[in-house]
């Protein structure tokens, strides 16, 4: 083999072992792209109302819907009247709150490992990992996707509530499989697969070759770790995150809520959720994004690149 042939073969082999990055699919790999994402739509009215307002204000570029939750039909109606809204499916395998609970889409007897003794989805990721099989996870996640489609939603992507579908290698396998089956990109950052995160055990890193083999593009990173619940301080922390963004495609995950008795009755994180809403409807945040040269994008743009690859 001559030198040219050797170099060509080396390049081919390298491309087969390197993950496909969204930043390469959508254009300039040196640019800073940011998805500002609203999680937990459908959970309650306060979550929906704040998310809709923030998306209409222009800084929140996408969201995802919890199909088993009580307020999902409000999201369906909103999507009908706002056909350009960028919504994915927030694959939901947990029901974490103390008194406000939801069940799987499938009858509990068909997915017994997913439900607690009261018939609700387990509160913790650890309980789901302990009791549920990959087959049950696949069946329920597929049912959630099919439910969304049957209601007329046009999902742009899949992602995960509480990280459960990426917390175990067998579950991550299901996540990739369903993404390919339904032609939807899945939310996976390279930084998580390389370094782990709060739900991801070390063995998930071993699945990076499977992600490469599946041809599923990756985000570069998730940006998070905001601690303060006081609205002004919370906004400052988000601005610090914006200033620290690196080139590539990064996602910030928000949990937005209105300052309502409903949300306060559901969760102790109500103040932080209202803080997220205030931070990403605030003129200072918009100005910082502009000054930093950050390009806001949504999952619809990534989905188009995914389907065209």
What are the language-model segments listed below?
Residues 68-69, 80-167, 189-195, 224:
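Metal-dependent polysaccharide deacetylase catalytic core of the NodB/CE4 family, i.e.
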Residues 134, 138, 142-212, 216-217, ...:
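Catalytic domains of cell-wall/extracellular-matrix polysaccharide-remodeling enzymes
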Residues 25-98:
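Active-site beta->alpha N-cap acidic-glycine motif
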Residues 33-35, 60-64, 84-90, 155-159, ...:
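Structural preference for beta-strand elements that scaffold enzyme active sites
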Residues 47, 98-101, 197-206, 229-235, ...:
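Histidine/acidic-residue-rich catalytic or RNA/ligand-binding cores of hydrolases
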Residues 186-187, 266-309:
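C-terminal domain-boundary segment and adjacent tail
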Residues 24-26, 51-57, 74-86, 103-116, ...:
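Acidic (Asp/Glu)-rich catalytic clusters
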Residues 5-8, 12-35:
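N-terminal pre-catalytic segment of deacetylase/amide-hydrolase enzymes
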């Amino acid at each position: 083999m001559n030198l040219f042939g050797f170099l060509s073969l080396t390049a081919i082999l390298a491309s087969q072992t390197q993950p496909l990055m969204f930043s390469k699919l959508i254009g300039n790999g040196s640019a800073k792209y940011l998805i500002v994402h609203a999680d937990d739509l459908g959970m309650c009215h306060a979550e929906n109302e704040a998310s809709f307002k923030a998306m209409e204000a222009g800084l929140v570029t996408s969201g995802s819907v919890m199909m088993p939750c009580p307020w999902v039909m409000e999201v369906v109606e909103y999507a009908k009247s706002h056909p350009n809204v960028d919504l994915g499916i927030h694959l939901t395998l947990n029901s974490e709150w103390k008194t406000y609970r939801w069940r799987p889409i499938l009858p509990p007897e068909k997915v017994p490992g997913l439900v607690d003794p009261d018939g609700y989805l387990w509160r913790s990721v650890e309980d789901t990992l302990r009791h549920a099989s990959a087959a049950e996870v696949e069946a329920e996640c597929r049912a959630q996707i099919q439910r969304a489609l049957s209601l007329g939603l046009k999902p742009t992507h899949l992602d995960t509530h509480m990280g459960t579908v990426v917390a175990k290698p067998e579950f991550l396998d299901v996540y990739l499989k369903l993404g390919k089956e339904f032609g939807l990109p899945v939310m996976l950052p390279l930084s998580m697969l390389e370094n782990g995160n709060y739900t991801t055990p070390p063995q998930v890193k071993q699945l990076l070759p499977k992600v490469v083999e599946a041809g599923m593009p990756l985000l570069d990173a998730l940006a998070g770790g905001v601690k303060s619940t006081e609205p002004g301080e919370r906004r400052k922390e988000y601005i610090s995150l914006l200033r620290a963004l690196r080139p590539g495609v990064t996602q910030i995950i928000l949990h937005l809520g209105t300052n309502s008795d409903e949300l306060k009755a559901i969760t102790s994180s109500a103040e932080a959720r209202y803080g997220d809403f205030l931070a990403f409807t605030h003129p200072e945040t918009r100005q910082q994004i502009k000054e930093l040269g950050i390009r806001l994008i949504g999952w619809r743009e990534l989905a188009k690149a995914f389907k065209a690859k």
